[in-house]
């Protein structure tokens, strides 16, 4: 059957969201292709660098009066034509004019475009516009609220693949591509590991978990006044940090949350929780306290268990062998033996921890008490149930803290190793270029200068040594060094800004990305940056980050930011991530009115 003759799909089966997306795409296509699309330029800020003025002169033509509007095709007849034909004009009904779009271009958006690309914000140069925005969104989107269904931690290997497989400009050399990859890796370390105070980074989440665990232990200590029996008070006292640190080289009074990273502290906390279950649990679920990961239990002895205990008897939390989805190289692990969980609760906790260590679920809760475990244990009297609940939450948080610390350490060392490899690769590239010039005997002054330059680059790169203690300082030195390499320094930021502004204001299509949830996310993030502005993460700003990932620094929350302060894009950006557009049939004012300087299919440029 001929595809042209096939009937269109029935409209009732199309979802409203898909229909809205198609309408939005068709509207964008009309804006790009319509030669009568006009643009109104709004001066809402200063133009200190003359970029906005030069952009308007290059790509827009002002319309000052009706004669210019007629020449641009916006109007049909001038006032002189109307006056000359006034006596012979017949009374005919006024024609119905089609409506054409008017796009509003704000000067502030043009100014803020400097930091709306990976080149301007992170100094990652040489990428095409589409790849540049993808890399920029991966780094700038770290503080966004996570989607509980689709969020995954981005690891260094996946991010480097994104940059390595990206499309580069045709004039970019191999050395410039390697420099861009190294700069992107260094910025990834800063954005995801060293920025302690920004929501969405692993170190910020680790600090918040340490603070939450301290609060849980403080509340558990406060329950001692509810118990009069010395045996019960002693059982709860064994679960507190002071007792768990006894005999260890770290003390809770001096090291505070740093003791949570100690393996012996974790083992003692699990043993104390096991004893607490054995003494306080009345439903029978706490009698079998784990350690048996093979799932072999007596299937006939369920008479003393509660219905929830029977349902979860064969699906213990500690039985499953889990792996982090984006860090499987860290190996398998088991969760602690937490009781009073149904089969659904066990599956939910295991899935949340293996997916993102509970980050997405934690970011959706309002109270830290309800971290991952369900509230309302009814297996004992309220006093005992509350004490078991606090101790169970603390033990589960301890396991996640240790897993998160291990992933942070691995990411940090892996990035340092990759950056050191990039530096060595650059040294080999420049040595190879110098060898080619030497074989050609450097016959003229230009070749001799090039040979001297390559030798200077090799000498400077040999002094770049990335370490854990001086990462930020070394990275700043590396950024300063690559500014002296012509292959990287000559990549123009102005051209990248022009391509971005031409695309977002519907003048010329700069990239044709398929409509996916990821591209919609990039579009919203881009317009948030264009409207509100941003600051470049360059050598002047990087020294404010600390290179130390010590236990004391990872657990330090004295000067932390608010617990949950994600980057809110605002309802206006979420609802309409694009320029303001209105449709008009008549032009009454010519103030601030512009049209494209080049029309579609004319010499000098194309709108599509």
UniProtKB/Swiss-Prot annotation:
Basic and acidic residues bias locations: 18-33
InterPro entries membership: UL27-like_protein_herpesevirus
Subcellular location: Host nucleus; Host nucleus, Host nucleolus
Pro residues composition-biased segments: 1-13
Keywords: Host nucleus
Any single Pfam family the record assigns to this protein: Herpes_U5
Protein's job: Promotes a cell cycle arrest in G0/G1 by inducing the proteasomal degradation of host histone acetyltransferase KAT5/Tip60.
Organism: Human cytomegalovirus (strain AD169)
Family affiliation: Belongs to the herpesviridae U4 family.
Subunit architecture: Interacts with host KAT5, PSME3 and EP400.
Domain of life: Viruses
Listed name of the protein: Protein UL27
Region described as Disordered: spans on this chain: 1-33
Keyword Phosphoprotein included in the entry's annotation: no
Record's GO cellular component terms: host cell nucleolus
